[in-house]
């Protein structure tokens, strides 16, 4: 099966371009002390910048910087602290030719990050925070709208679906419409089905199996499967750092069904897998 987003287009950031008709790797850069698989490894600006540059060399075309953990049960971080963690890293990386995404739900954080040189807003809460929709419209930057129910502290109790794929598409479509209604441009929207957020293992597998149905929404799709717990369960309880190959396999399955970007901790193995898949398409 070969599907790509129904509305492929190019995002342009000055002299940087992101062609969404081709699959890309978004490298994960957590500047948090408590992320589920790499918390505390990149707390210092120098370590974070070094890791970002390493991921670029490994094949990442976007670096996604997060200052708040959204693992199950994670506590909310104060806005000032999130800005303190994120902005210095953005300022330093902005000196390099790299597209920067900010993993935040706080309008104040994305505004500060954009002033520092960030390009994309990746919001796991789908612009539900106060003033988030208006901020997305005003900033006029690409925004990734993800499906989640509740908060990280409550989402594991909100995984009741009649049909997980149908329900995710319906709920995600409503959030996209809410964004359009306040003036967010359709060409600035990317969607993310939210693997691991308010979904159990079987629901995640079904959503991956039916990933192609998300293309019916007509927007570019981000697939964020890296080191997810359900992949560890499939791999007989593998620890997060042992899930690189399983994650890359799942990401390839989503690319085959229409994903144009995958969000990964293990950039090189993911980028290499995509290269092999792309070579196969050329035969």
Residue map of PLM features:
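Catalytic-pocket segment enriched in acidic/His residues
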Residues: 33
